[in-house]
Design a protein with these regions (language model features):
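Extra-cytoplasmic beta-strand recognition segments
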Residues: 1-19, 48-56, 86-88, 194, ...
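GH16 jelly-roll
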Residues: 91, 100-373
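Beta-strand acidic-aromatic groove motif in beta-rich domains, primarily in extracellular
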Residues: 13-25, 62-67, 213-221, 249-251
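Beta-strand signatures of extracellular beta-sandwich domains
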Residues: 17-21, 81, 88, 295-297
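Extended, low-complexity, turn-rich repeat/linker tracts enriched in Gly/Pro/Ser/Thr and Asp/Glu
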Residues: 9-17, 26-27, 58, 74-76, ...
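Extracellular beta-strand ligand-recognition surfaces/modules
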Residues: 49-88, 217-222, 336-349
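Trp-centered recognition loops
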Residues: 3, 9, 43-51, 61, ...
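Extracellular carbohydrate recognition and processing domains
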Residues: 27-61, 77, 240
Length: 373
């Protein structure tokens, strides 16, 4: 209605309309839908109710804005003296029910095919056990590798025990667990050193990440030969890093530095359909790598591109050498924002269900070479 303090109401006949605009923040808040309804009269005394109907895709249109108001089409007059009350947005469909938590579910997705790349190696974890001709376990707190706390003051001890790492149903499961009797976290860390190396091409990994305070899952690569010396001189390539319950974010990084630790990194925010913890459908992180630079791609969308020429003091360039892959889920350390909460972790030697949202799950690792013709 119009405030009673204003002299005039809107009376028939009138070109006045009530309207709703749908705005897309990803396109400069441009109007993607305009819905209006004739409002021939607006009283100074009585409220009038006007209903307008639109459809909203809760996934594709998440974050869209709505504007509502009144406009006299004939004069483009948009008076400030119109009062609104009791604005109600009603959903026509019930939200999708939250799926029941799963245990050791594997989607068994197949690696993608690309017109400009040829698949040259893959591990779909289709056997009953880990292929130890490719993958080897790393153990302990890092001391035997010269990096106590794994260089990051991490809390966990790595094992090769079936409690922490196993292959079943076509997926690899890495499970950080808490031992109540020892007040100690255990997890697993695998690497393909001396088993499978990578040098240029495209690398795809199908995965789902855990979501607990203090967890630090990673899919990454280290140099096969340390040609230019220890870390970071010979480089490090992080395809994916997550932390805590921040499943709506993904971090991708290239580390290097002949003089001191340098890195080029990008945090990317994700919409719900791309959250990193998705035990039912999984996600695909890809690294496209050549002698010019890197591109990180997530679920088919480019996240981040870097050219070597833009990296200061890179030469001699370690990213022209061979690398191997690491898969692990750390607990605590410098990276997570929160201290680990034991109540959120699966328990060691416990018969209670350990849910897939508490595990780093790898569906496959696929390596492609770019076609030359």
């Amino acid at each position: 209605k119009r405030p009673e303090s204003l002299q005039y109401s809107v009376a028939a006949p009138s070109n006045a309309k009530a309207f709703i605009k749908k705005l897309d923040p990803n396109a400069g808040f441009s109007t993607v839908e305009y819905i209006s309804k004739d409002v021939t009269e607006i009283s100074r005394n009585d409220w009038s109710r006007h209903e307008l109907t639109t459809e909203v895709d809760s996934v594709a249109e998440q974050g869209f804005y709505f504007q509502f108001g009144y406009n006299n089409v004939a004069t483009s007059y948009n008076p400030s003296g119109v009062l609104y009350d009791n604005v109600v947005i009603e959903g026509g469909l019930a939200p999708e029910p939250t799926p029941a938590p799963t245990v050791d579910f594997c989607p068994n997705n197949s690696p993608n095919e690309y017109d400009d790349y040829t698949l040259t190696w893959e591990d779909q974890f289709s056997e009953d056990s880990l292929d130890t001709s490719v993958w080897s376990y790393m153990y302990g707190d890092g001391s035997q590798y010269g990096i106590p706390g794994w260089g990051n003051s991490e809390w966990q001890l790595y094992t090769g025990d079936a409690e922490n790492v196993y292959v079943v149903n076509g997926c690899l499961y890495i499970v950080p667990k808490y031992s109540q009797s020892e007040d100690q976290y255990y997890s697993a860390r695998l690497r393909s050193k001396d088993g499978q190396t990578f040098q240029f091409g495209r690398i795809d990994v199908g995965f789902s990440a855990p979501a607990m305070d203090g967890v630090w899952p990673a899919i990454w690569m280290m140099p096969e030969d340390d040609r230019y010396g220890g870390w970071p001189r010979s480089g490090e390539i992080d395809l994916f890093e997550g932390k805590d319950k921040l499943i709506d974010q993904i971090n991708t990084t290239a580390h290097y530095g002949h003089d001191f630790h340098r890195y080029y990194s990008r945090w990317t925010s994700l919409t719900p359909q791309d959250y990193t913890s998705d035990p039912i459908n999984h996600n695909v992180i890809s690294l496209i790598w050549d002698d010019v630079g890197f591109e990180w791609v997530y679920n088919g969308v480019s996240l981040f591109t870097v050219e070597y020429a833009s990296l200061p003091n890179l030469e001699p360039n370690p990213f022209l050498e061979r690398f191997h892959m690491l898969l692990n889920s750390a607990v605590g350390g410098h990276y997570p924002a929160y201290a680990p909460n034991p109540d959120q972790y699966c328990k060691l030697n416990d018969t209670a269900a350990c849910y897939d949202s508490q595990k780093l799950i790898i569906d496959y690792v696929a390596y492609y070479q770019k076609n030359t013709n």
